[in-house]
Amino acid sequence: MSSQTAPRRRVTIHELRRMKDAGEKIAVVTAYDATAARLADAAGVDVVLVGDSLGMVVQGHESTLPVTLEHMIYHSAAVRRGLARSSGRAHLVGDMPFGSYQASADEAVKSAMRLVAEGGVESVKLEGGAEFVEVIRRIARAGVPVMGHIGLTPQAVHRMGGYVVQGKDSEKAQQLLRDARALELAGCYAIVLECIPAELARIISSQLRIPTIGIGAGLHCDGQVLVLNDLLGMDDAFTPKFVKRFGEIGQAISTAVGAYVGEVKRRVFPDDAHSFHSSTVRLVPAAPVDEDDGEPSGGVMGAPV
């Protein structure tokens, strides 16, 4: 019997469905660059999402609205390269940003196909409920799997009046359940449930055949998603209720950079261990360049031979 570890099964949309049926929880991480993707994949995440949240986390905007399709393609391609440097097991999903699918189904299909062809994603995610059923059908018919996203949908932040929990009353909860069913019938292979009551998320998850991925939606979703920067504790100022910090990397980074600055200022870094040396290099006089004619005009030590 071989002592080598068998390769982990590549996560596909069919594998995610199998995981739901088997009661196996799905771990999703949002990442934006090659290094983060490589580390997340090596840690065993099932899905890496390149989220349009990069507008806030990476670009420093107040919302996701300024993010363009070009931005999403750029970051998706970087994440794809990172996954290629690891096991490449994780399924890669790319967000469809604001303005890339709302205008028409034709535009949506083109946007989705670009994310696949140029960004290297295996599926796309879009926000919205039953009003996007035809868009989802068209994208799916074009051969691109679609992950839905209901509840708090950040691209609709102005309509929602801010980043607030959705579905807290019976009428709105019923609408979210209808939306979830409509997205499943339209062809979504999974749905993100963001910032809705845990009780509602449990009902939706139990009534759908496709996996639900929760963020701020309680324990009973089929999977969970967090932004890598958030779960690592990169930003002390961002502390939403649904984020658990599994590390305090932000403080560790500040400490490490502070130590670097201190050693530079004290002339401690770089030491011999971090410098290159040669016993054969010697310098001979080199004439400086005359400012008038550009010709050497005197002796200056500095030309290696």
UniProtKB/Swiss-Prot annotation:
One GO CC term on file: cytoplasm
Cofactor annotation: Mg(2+)
Key words of the record: Cytoplasm, Magnesium, Metal-binding, Pantothenate biosynthesis, Transferase
EC assignment: 2.1.2.11
Matches recorded under CDD domains: KPHMT-like (cd06557)
Chemical reaction(s) catalysed: 3-methyl-2-oxobutanoate + (6R)-5,10-methylene-5,6,7,8-tetrahydrofolate + H2O = 2-dehydropantoate + (6S)-5,6,7,8-tetrahydrofolate
Biological process terms in GO annotation: pantothenate biosynthetic process
Molecular function in Gene Ontology: 3-methyl-2-oxobutanoate hydroxymethyltransferase activity; magnesium ion binding
Listed Gene3D superfamilies: Phosphoenolpyruvate-binding domains
Family: Belongs to the PanB family.
Subunit field text: Homodecamer; pentamer of dimers.
NCBIfam families, sorted: panB, PRK00311.1
The protein's name in its UniProt record: 3-methyl-2-oxobutanoate hydroxymethyltransferase
Organism for this UniProt entry: Anaeromyxobacter sp. (strain Fw109-5)
Upper lineage: Bacteria, Pseudomonadati, Myxococcota, Myxococcia, Myxococcales
Gene: panB
